[in-house]
Amino acid sequence: GSITTAKLANGSVTSGKLASGAVSVDANTMPVGSILQVQTAKFTQQHNMNSNSFGDKGYTIQITPNFSNSKIILTCYLHFQLFRSDQESSWMVRIRKNGSTLKDMNSYHYYEAHPSYQSRVVHRANMPITYLDTAGGTSQITYDFYLGTGHGSSNSNQIATSKWQEDLFTAMEI
């Protein structure tokens, strides 16, 4: 049978009286831009890179979307130090989704020293990245961030992450 609101006293039904999953939300009733969930990850391990190819450093975040047409906003804050015993240095970031490349950012952060200081380039900073993706399904999504250097592959061109602060990653479903 059905119960009409005329037979229920105001405030008589509380969340404790409802079975888990008894109430669902239709995507069409949610206001545009509603945040459905937020997943976060932080990494404190230092990584040193001296290769001009992308490498897996364990930067991973996972999210299971509620709707296939949801947007996923990825943000990450990498804290890094560039070093090169020459005039310039840079580094690269690759964002992957379930093992496939979404976006390559070659020479994402580029630093060049004044010619009189060519013997050594050191630059410390943080790097924010934001990327907008479409879920494309409701199965768990794994996002990986691969890193590398953009100017050569030797110990004279190095990048170190988490030198003094943790690296933070967020996946937000809207």
Name each model feature, range by range.
Residues 42, 47-53, 65-140, 144-174:
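Terminal beta-strand-rich extracellular "head" domains
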Residues 59-63:
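Extended, low-complexity regulatory regions
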Residues 1-50, 54-57:
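Fibrous stalk/shaft segments of extracellular and virion attachment machinery
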